[in-house]
Amino acid sequence: MATALQKQLAAIAASSTHQLDLKAQKSAHGKSLLFEPKIAASQSFETVYLICYEGFRDLCALDSRFLQFSKSLFSEQSKVEDRTQMTKEENKKLNAVVEAFITLVVNTPGFFNALQAHTVRVVKAGHQAPQMISFWSTITLEAVFGILENTSSGRRDIQSQKTEELVLRILPVLNSCMQAKYGAETVAACYSIVTVLAGRGELGEKVLDGLMEAVVLAHEADSLNACLQCLAVLAEQRSPAQLPPRVIRRLLKVPQLSQKLVQISKQCRVHRLTLGCALGALASIDRLEEQRDVFQELMASGLLTEAYTRAALAALVTSIRDSAPGSTEHGQLLDLAAQLAETTYFLDGMRAAAKSDNVDLESLGLTLAPALETAQIDNDEDEDMLDVDDVSSQAIAAPKVEVPDFAVQSFLELDASQSFAEVANAFERAVSTHQSSPFLASKSLGKENAMHSNLYLSLLARIWCSSQLPAARIAALRAAAATLKSAEDTCDFQNLIPYLLHALADPSAPVRRAAAACTVALSEASGSQANTSTWGSSKLYGSSGKAQKHVSQVVQLKSEDVSTLLSSILIPMLEESVMDPTFAIPAIREVLEGSKGSKSQPKHGMNAQTRTYYRLSFFASHLSLSPLVRIRIILFPIFNFSGKVSDTVRSNTILPLIQGWCTLPLAEASKVCDVEKVTLEDAYRGHLNALVAREAKSVQLLNELMIESLDSSKRLLAEAVFDKVAAVWPATKSEQRVTLARTLLDMSFKEGKDDGEKQCRERAIEILRNVKHDSATLLTFLESVPAAVQMPEGPPTKKRRRTSRNEMARVELASQDDVQRFVAKADFGFFELIEGSNPGQPSQPFSRVYSLSSTTWQPLKQQSGSELVYVQSMILGSLTPIVDTLKVSDLVVHGFMHANTVQQQKDTADYQSSVRADLLIDCIRHSTSPQVQNSALLLIANLASWVPELILHNLMPIFTFIGSTLLRQQDDYSAQVVDKVWCYHFTQTISRVVPQLAASLRAKHKNFLTGVSDLLLSFTAAFEHIPLHRRLKLFSELARTLGPQDSLSAIISLLADRYHNGKTQRRFSTELLLVFDPIHTLDAIKGYLDLVVDAAGPKRKVSDSLFGLNDKTAAQVETAIKNLLVSLADLATDDRLRAHVTRAFRRKDDPARPREVFANIVETTIQLSKKVASSPKLYEACSRVLANCLDLLPTTDLVKSAELLLVNTDHQVQIAAIKAVELRAGNAVQNDKKSVISLISFLPSVEKVLQQSQHTDAKIISVGCIDRIVERFGKKDMTAVASIAQTIAGSQALSSGNDTIRVLSLLCLTSIVDVLEDEAIALLPTVLPTAFDYLSQAIEGEKNGLHNAVYSLLSNIVERLGYMFSRDYLETALRLSHRSAVGGLEDTCDESRRTFYQNVSEHLGAQETFAAIKTTWPHALSQGFEASSEHLELLRSTVDLQSKSKLIKASSTLSEQAIDSQEEQEYDDEEMNQLDNTLMSRTCHGSEAQRCPPSGPFFVQLVDQEGPMSAKPEYAVTFYKFLAAFFDKFKSDCSRATQATSSTTQPKMLEHVAQEDADSELRSAVLGALQKSFQHDQDAFWQAPSHFGTILKPLVNLLTISATEEVTEVVIPTITDLAASSSSSIDNHRELNTILLRYMRSDSAATRLATVKCEQSLTTRLGEEWLGLLPEMLPFISELREDDDEMVERETQRWISQVEGVLGESLEGMLQ
């Protein structure tokens, strides 16, 4: 049973990619783009270099820029460079060189892509020129041709990939450009590209179909020929003959298609395109009659080859057959076929197509002229052996076939081959012309005397066993059957049985059926009488002198045995034999072998050995005497079984026969095979298949034939022999396998003189590598190694050489060539095969291999002047699996498995005595090859778990080597070596060795860490070189092996000291601690601190060995200690580590242990802080360590520890403890009740520190801790929070002189208000005045933090206790907010202030808020625009957020605010407009929210107090803007407001603004309000004559003002809206028109121009309704056409055109 060790080693061997894995090396080396894998694998680096260097010289001749690579990539040194041995930096530099070379040598696809994109853009824009298209097509054609040419060599998958990439780059361009609208030149250029692409590349069917459709759709009359040529090329590349439907439809529409195809056939092949067109025309005949003419023209064009013509005619016949008889389509097809049948060529083609499809043309309704039917095989013939020569009466007589002259008595004689060939050929012609009966009846063949003569039946038997056509073989079998049926009962035809068996294995089913019928006839003709005569018993194979020496005559079976063989064996298997050609021979072998499971075996069986012997002898004698190689190849498998009976026949007949054939001269064997039309290779393989693997004589013969095959003329024999050796090897017995192995090994080392020997050598090496070898074979290989006694004994004299330490002296062999040959032989023959075999019984090989490594290979290494890396690796690789097996044997010895213990123990002791660890250590330490080092380490690992006492003293050098060298390797194999060596074997070894090592160190009064310091330093030094994915596993195994209690702290501290608290080191240290038990983490921290204490003490012990402090100055020592402390402090902050340590305190088995360890950690930290008190940096670092270590504890334990630490008067300790609790409070979970209770219980302790401590830092951290606890868990215990609230609001916190404490206190009070809510009311009288005072100071001093903290508290009080926030508080807050708005503070201050405003708007009452807003409005105005804007924004938000009921209650206040808000300061226009807009928008929004438009008292009050004729006319602007906003907002709901400002106010204001010195802004505001009133007058207020007449005259009078721009933009639209509001009153319009007509005759040109523009606006707006007054206007229009002012004339003409457009008629006649 495989152990875990064996499985691991098997995993290494399976996944290893190192150079020692020959199969993997060969596979990797065989990857090439230029050569086949087999060729590439055989090429050396020297060969590859020469090939590359030749090309490189050519490149340098073309471009001198390549010369720079002659010193790098193409230097002599490049042949020996190994990337796996290069450093990461060296590989990076090499990559840069390779990339530079590739960039220089490859083509430039960027230009090609840019050219294609540019061409597509130009073509799509229609700007292409012939020169450009020619240039583009030339470049693209050359590029496509070149790419396809380059992809024509190399591996198939790479060719397909490159072709696909090219197609993906080219097809989009062709798709864009190959369109008829872009011109014939562009399309023709695309056709050329498609032609090259399809002709040179291997495209898929879908791509070809798509290209054909695109090509045919893009053609025009000018490009038709080019289109057809392109389609012809595409059709040649397609597999199916039918063209795509869209293509065939377009092609069949081409006039005179056949003539066009004939024209282009001179330039390219059009056969498949013509066939596709013909098939397409044939398929559409039923729809279009003209397609019949197209089909006929294409058939008659001569463009189709004979095969394609038959394909078209076959399609025609199939169409006739599949069409419905009597249908129109059927009639058309018959007419077409009849027309084609008038031509003999097409008639023969249709007949052939009909025969191949088994279609009777006459049954289809097609009557053809009679013709000679050719000979055919009827697959459905009966078994009645009818004469095959029956000829139809319609057949035309053919020339008579005569029998050639011959002079043989039997056609199975050895010399009858020539005569048989002539007669057989004549017989085949006779069969084809239905003359077989006359031919066989020829007197010379002796058919009448067939029972007593060998001539006739021997001819037939040889014919059906020959390579003649199936028809001839069938005719021969039928003729023989007919003869057997007419035979006499006294004749025995047993000698035909072997030949009938051959026929039953024929590959043709009709032949096997004929053979079955003949076998039945033979069985019926065989008589059971004892006195029957046997046909062929005399001279069947000629005279005995010509027979084989080992067989003189045919063995004859008894009549009853023949009858049994036929009736009980052959006849039952006939049915299955006819179905399966491979059934008959195995079935016969099973019967003869005596297999009871054979279906063919009769019940009474053939079990007698004598009977079996005679039957085998019968078949063997025929095979020996028959001249036919075919029959031997077929019947040889009958003898492929072992047994007493068969062994005799095989030894006497079969094996000599095989040997005789395989040793025939090549010319003679080739001649025999040529006569029978059998390949010589098949003949050799057929004979060798008769060899049996378990038979000694067969293996011996195979071994002899291997030697025979060294002859260069026997290459085919060699291939067959070696294939047979590989096939029989697994089943061969061990003794015979050793014989074959020796021969193969000898052949593998022969230096080939010719091709034959080279071939044999390669095949021998291949077989030895691929087959499995047992221990006996491997031992045979090892025994071939020369003994050490053949070498000179002892080292040379000291005068000549000195022997270096731990190395063997150099010795000399006979010559250097002997050394090289010996090494080469051992490389392959011994260790390579041994390594690849993994022997199961390694007893003998182990001792022998180890002996070779110590006595032979060390001298050879010295003698050869080389390290013999490959040989050493082979030796070590061979020993490793042997040791694995020996370890299993060792388990047997110790009673873990059942076996012969005494013998096993004796063997195990012998094997252990052969082990020499010093040799392996030398391999590790002195070899420069990583392969040798890795192999030696694997072997040592196995030995360590087997015989650990032998490597105990070499343990530390091995560890040091791994840490300093192997861990830095980047290759996968080194990783696996380290993993296996370290993780498994050395773990076991150290578990047995380390206790002894520790005991030894303690006995010598030495510290354990001091003893292993070198080991630890080696591994930590290699830390940064070890790949990331391997670090954790390696160091965890190191710590586990050495003991985590002692080693873990040392490893962590060494990493911290060496890498100075780097992120990588810190993260790794955390992960390493997480691997082990939580208690080990605490132990590691304690040990870490012990090391730091030792380093800080006056007498250092362990720290000197680990950190090398003796070599450092005092400052350097202090820095080192600081780095260690900082690293530990940072390490303790990791969340994962904290969670890990927490689990230590939750253990139930030993709960006291973690507390004891942690108490020691605290004590040690305090001791350390006292020691380094003189150094502030170290003291601070100790404080951090203490705080962070406290943070490692669970919450309950942390709080208890912190309470104890607060007793300490050292404020830094207090700060650390409180900070730890604060941090824990921020991370604690709400559901953790124990933690929450413990944290709340901590409040009195921290309150005490706040009250008593004189240190600001302590106060700051205390307030912060209280805030954190209250914020997160205050709701859990409101009583505790209430008790601490007074302290926070008192002199020690809120009233402190330190701004930081003030800020924290304010934030803490914010949290307290959140928790206490109503319970916090008592704090307000104390807190709010202080807060307002701090806010005032913050604004003046620009203290942003204090400012924001106050607003945070105020916002929270407003939100939680809004009903207690009085108007006085609010007014104070608003005034301070005004100052804050203009104070120039940060953006965060603005945000906090807006938050406060938002809370005021949402949580305070509307009445109080509006009152405070009104009261503080003057103050806001006095502070500036920002304050005023925010003040109004507060008004807006209050209106938005308050409910309807509250707004109604506060409506009077809101109205007063709106009226008072007009009294604004002197701001600039932009600010004024912004304030006005804000005020108007919010007032309207408030009214809308109340669902009561301002048409009541508010609006009357507003009009009376601030209306257009108030004491302050400048406020009228704001008033009318209000008015416009109201009208626009409430639309038809503002009728009462319209009435309030109509007759009494508006005319007066219009008269006021009509004055020249009136304010233009006021004028625009007044007209804007009027315009909105006109637009929304749905109650017809302005339509009333009283209202209309009142407003009309002052409004129209504004046309006379000098402000032309205002007239156009404001006055005229307002007049137009007034007219539109009275659209149904003609009187109002006439009144308006009268005034306008009067103004048309004004003396002022500006007035006349304004009046004309007003008329234009009215005409546009009112249309025909206004033009009803046209008769009154016409005289005035005529006058204006001749006005003195040019502008008036122009605008008048534009007005006339406008009127004509509305009326649809000219005014010219009316104006005359």
UniProtKB/Swiss-Prot annotation:
Annotated HEAT repeat ranges: 164-202, 490-528, 564-605, 987-1025, 1236-1275, 1605-1646, 1667-1705
Keyword presence, Transmembrane helix: no
GO biological process, any: positive regulation of transcription by RNA polymerase I
Annotated Pfam families: BP28CT (PF08146), HEAT_HEATR1 (PF23243), U3snoRNP10 (PF12397)
Record InterPro entries: ARM-like, ARM-type_fold, BP28_C_dom, HEAT_type_2, HEAT_Utp10/HEAT1, U3snoRNP10_N, UTP10
Keyword list, A-Z: Nucleus, Repeat, Ribonucleoprotein, Ribosome biogenesis, rRNA processing
Glycoprotein recorded as keyword: no
GO cellular component, one term: small-subunit processome
Segments forming a coiled coil: none
Family membership: Belongs to the HEATR1/UTP10 family.
Subunit note: Component of the ribosomal small subunit (SSU) processome.
Name the record gives this protein: U3 small nucleolar RNA-associated protein 10
Gene responsible for this protein: UTP10
